[in-house]
Amino acid sequence: MANLVVHFEIHASEPQRLVDFYSQLLGWKFTQFGDIPYWTIETGEGAIGNVAGSAGHGINGGLTQRRGPKPEPGAPVMGCNLVVGVDDVDSLMARGTELGGTVARPAEDMQGVGRTGYLLDPDNNVFGMISAVMSDGTIGMGGGES
């Protein structure tokens, strides 16, 4: 293995609230791991670490009980950001706010990359979303058109 990122963790003051948020927003499946406050996260078919065990195009993760206060709104990011590849950044940004998230950075086009946006989940964890399709319908990564 060549130092690949193979797992992520989300810290939660109220785990069930974030299980519901990410399940409804991104369709992720959460399974509690024994009697401890930890849930495995399956992000979808083809993810590294799925039941089939074969490498794919993404990674699975976990959700754990936070051991301390949740981040205050406007606080600098501590740690790493999770960025999720999606089909439509704008619709998921809107859905995320309906589910209790807050816009951390509005959706915008990044020339040559695609469309990105960042939300705070209901526990103030920041995460991003990215799509190759920009607002004008062109493809950022790869330079083609949709």
Where are these regions (language model features)?
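N-terminal beta-strand motif that seeds the catalytic metal site of vicinal oxygen chelate
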Residues: M1-D20, Q24, G79-V84, I130-S146
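Vicinal oxygen chelate
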Residues: V5-S13, E42-E45, G56, T64-S146, ...
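Flexible, glycine-rich phosphate/dinucleotide-binding loops
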Residues: A47, K70, V133-D136
